[in-house]
Design a protein with these regions (language model features):
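SAM-dependent nucleic-acid methyltransferase catalytic core
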Residues: 2-118, 122-130
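Glycine-rich S-adenosyl-L-methionine
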Residues: 132-135
Length: 135
């Protein structure tokens, strides 16, 4: 939605509140059947909002796949960062960018030899996924 409808996305984000009550109502949507009824704009805004207002911007889900990072308690988070959203939209619309979600072993075989690739696999440590693992 950043690429196709940045203005609509910003407008949606501007309605979002920085309160624990609003945060937890948005966070809990993935536990309700209504999540699938949201528009693409609303789903994109939800992810951006949660990232900007949750603790340390940490995207984390529990074993059931539900987002479970707590409210970040920031005094003035920038939820609807219009200049950044517009700049990213312009870049995505003018550059040859392809964002892919898939098995890395398959995706890598489909790329040209001069492609820039970023892979972000989880690091497993016992029964817990470690977000940063240093040697």
């Amino acid at each position: 939605m950043v690429k196709q409808s940045p203005e609509k996305l910003v407008k949606e984000l501007e309605t979002y509140e920085n309160t624990p009550e609003f945060f937890y109502s948005i966070r809990s949507l993935d536990q309700q059947p209504g999540l699938h009824a949201l528009t693409d704009i609303q789903r994109a805004a939800r992810i951006i909002y949660l990232n900007r207002t949750c603790f340390n911007g940490l995207y984390r889900v529990n074993s059931q796949g539900y987002f479970n990072t707590p409210f970040g308690q920031y005094k003035h988070p920038v939820i609807a960062n219009k200049p950044v959203i517009m700049a990213v939209s312009e870049y995505l619309n003018t550059a040859n960018v392809k964002i892919v979600c898939g098995d890395y072993s398959i995706v890598l075989k489909q790329l040209p030899s001069d492609a820039f690739v970023y892979l972000d696999p989880p690091s497993h440590h016992g029964n817990f996924i470690v977000h940063l693992l240093y040697p």
